[in-house]
């Protein structure tokens, strides 16, 4: 996907930019919102709250990406598809009314192609994450998640690869469908 096209498109249209600080929420799952958000810079975590009250983490996003697009395109207001929490010191977003966003998409073929590619990519990512969690057990889910973190935050060091991002065992548990951080600690010690 051509993130530069998306960012330049919003810049040309003078779409307002907002900033959020670490551990503040941009959206809450299920609450009404009228805007579409596009991450410009920073790191965010998307998650939902399960029926038993636990948080199920969906993904970290650290590149320009459309954040809140997974609902219908005609309603002025729609419920947020998930929680979005800022994980970097600051994150910057473009904020555009949903109806105006979809108007732009319908008028611009390249933006339409971007949105179609966005949906295909998000579906592929969701299938891959589910496959990793379902087919590999808890240890495999953690290993797979750590491998995904290398692609997002990894940098080469003398001893190998360093995941240059602070993440708690509780967050790892939330990404891997594990109930407690103690289970994550035990599995990490066994690796």
Predicted segments, located by residue:
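Glycine- and acidic-residue-biased ligand/ion/polar-headgroup-sensing regions
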Residues: 34-47, 52, 63-64
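His/acidic/aromatic-lined binding-pocket segments of jelly-roll/cupin-type domains
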Residues: 17-18, 27-29, 33-40, 57-59, ...
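Short alpha-helical segments that sit at the start of domains
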Residues: 129-155
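Cyclic-nucleotide recognition modules
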Residues: 59-120, 124
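Phosphate-/nucleic-acid-contacting segments
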Residues: 152-191
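A residue-level structural signature of the nucleotidyltransferase/glycosyltransferase Rossmann-like core
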Residues: 36, 58, 92-93, 164
């Amino acid at each position: 996907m051509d993130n530069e096209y998306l960012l330049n498109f919003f810049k040309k249209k003078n779409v307002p930019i907002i900033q959020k600080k670490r551990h503040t929420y941009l959206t809450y799952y299920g609450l009404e919102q009228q805007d579409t958000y596009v991450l410009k810079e920073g790191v965010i975590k998307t998650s939902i709250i399960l029926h038993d009250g636990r948080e199920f983490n969906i993904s970290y996003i650290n590149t320009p990406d459309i954040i809140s697009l997974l609902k219908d395109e005609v309603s002025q207001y729609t419920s947020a598809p998930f929680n979005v929490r800022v994980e970097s010191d600051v994150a910057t977003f473009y904020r555009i009314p949903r109806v105006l966003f979809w108007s732009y998409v319908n008028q611009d073929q390249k933006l339409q192609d971007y949105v179609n590619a966005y949906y295909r990519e998000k579906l592929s990512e969701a299938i891959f994450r589910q496959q990793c969690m379902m087919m590999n057990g808890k240890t495999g889910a953690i290993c797979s998640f750590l491998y995904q973190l290398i692609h997002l935050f990894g940098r080469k060091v003398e001893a190998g690869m360093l995941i240059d991002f602070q993440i708690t065992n509780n967050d790892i548990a939330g990404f891997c469908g594990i109930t407690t951080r103690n289970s994550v600690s035990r599995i990490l010690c066994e690796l």
